[in-house]
Swiss-Prot record:
L-aspartate binds at K77, R159, R211. NCBIfam families: asp_carb_tr (TIGR00670), PRK00856.1 (NF002032). Heterododecamer (2C3:3R2) of six catalytic PyrB chains organized as two trimers (C3), and six regulatory PyrI chains organized as three dimers (R2). Belongs to the aspartate/ornithine carbamoyltransferase superfamily. ATCase family. Keywords: Pyrimidine biosynthesis, Transferase. It catalyses: carbamoyl phosphate + L-aspartate = N-carbamoyl-L-aspartate + phosphate + H(+). Its EC number is 2.1.3.2. It comes from Listeria welshimeri serovar 6b (strain ATCC 35897 / DSM 20650 / CCUG 15529 / CIP 8149 / NCTC 11857 / SLCC 5334 / V8). One of its GO terms (molecular function) is amino acid binding. One of its GO terms (biological process) is 'de novo' pyrimidine nucleobase biosynthetic process. This is Aspartate carbamoyltransferase catalytic subunit. InterPro entries: Asp/Orn_carbamoyltranf_P-bd, Asp/Orn_carbamoylTrfase, Asp/Orn_carbamoylTrfase_sf, Asp_carbamoyltransf, Asp_carbamoyltransf_Asp/Orn-bd. It is an enzyme of class 2 (transferase). One of its GO terms (cellular component) is cytosol. The gene is pyrB.
Length: 303
């Protein structure tokens, strides 16, 4: 695996290998690189969980993290992302984790020698979040085959939903969608069934809630926080109807009492904090696999 750009680019075998490596890290596996290794985290959109968990993952692996601030870089002078990465490559940086507001920003960057990990591209994909979601689900249920999984909320604007719906169907899960119709596209019906949240709540194994992404909406929104919560959110009353072994997930940040009742965020069924914890281990696995492959290819080229 040279880069991690999208979930669609991963084979099922590669996904399973990453999940297994993450499990090993969670259970105490240690890993460092023999050669000095450098990473740069280039975030052009705000981030808490993805940014910090990648940095923790890098440091746990013994990777040296190079500071980068987009607002003080030469990109403010018109330098392209390609040329910025070419610079990073030239000075010896091995891997770049990038979050960008543009979908498919990585087109044309794949042939650079520096490895690229997509930390989220606009409304496109968020592969490391998708992998940590898979890791969390597999920890709970041991399989994806036959699981009923609900994806609820601002689906159209969610890169997490875009990544998850495709891979979960590939892995054998049955998907259900819910949320405002104007934030849903009929093309998603290729992956699952649209229902109201009340129609699905009693049947699903995983209730995956999505943040209302106000920053990606144009025009006036027709929902207040209270009205959205009442119509589309996981209220305390709805949560009481969940199956006994069902779990609640959310990629965060959470809008409490909008997508999910405040009292449910840290409830017994919630795996929201677990997802954050698992993010470090899956990102360690991603970096280890990519950097070891990069090292292997470099050695082959020297012979």
């Amino acid at each position: 695996m040279k880069n991690l750009l999208s979930m669609e680019a991963l084979t099922v075998h590669e996904i399973e290998h990453l999940l297994e490596q993450a499990a090993q890290f969670k259970h105490g596996k240690k890993a460092t690189f023999k050669e000095q290794t450098f990473a740069v985290n280039m975030f052009f959109e705000p981030s808490t969980r993805t940014h910090t968990s990648f940095e923790v993952a890098e440091k746990k692996l013994g990777v040296e993290v190079i500071s980068f601030d987009a607002s003080s870089s030469s990109m403010t002078k018109g330098e392209t992302l390609y040329d910025t990465l070419l610079t990073m490559q030239a000075v010896g940086v091995n891997v770049a984790v990038i979050r960008h507001s543009d979908e498919n920003y990585y087109a044309g960057l794949e042939n650079l020698d520096i490895a690229i990990v997509n930390g989220g591209d606009g409304c496109g994909e968020h592969p490391s979040q998708s992998l940590l979601d898979l890791f969390t689900i597999k920890e709970q249920f041991g399989t994806f085959q036959g699981l009923k999984i609900a994806i609820v909320g601002d689906i159209r604007h969610s890169r997490v939903a875009n990544s998850n719906m495709k891979v979960l169907k590939r892995l054998g899960a049955e998907l259900f969608f819910s949320g405002p119709r104007e934030w849903f596209d009929d093309s998603y019906l290729a992956y699952g069934t649209y229902l109201s949240i009340d129609e699905m709540v009693e049947k699903v194994d995983v209730m995956m809630l999505l943040r209302v992404q106000h920053e990606r909406h144009s025009g006036t929104e027709r929902f207040t926080k209270a009205s959205y919560h009442e119509k589309f959110g996981l209220t305390e009353e709805r949560a009481m109807k969940l199956k006994e072994d069902a779990i609640i997930m959310h990629p965060s940040p959470v809008n409490r009492d909008v997508e999910i009742a405040d009292s449910l965020v840290e409830s017994e069924k919630s795996r929201i904090v677990t997802q954050m914890t698992n993010g470090v281990f899956i990102r360690m696995a991603i970096l280890e696999v990519i950097l070891k492959e990069k090292s292997r290819r470099a050695k082959v080229c020297t012979y």
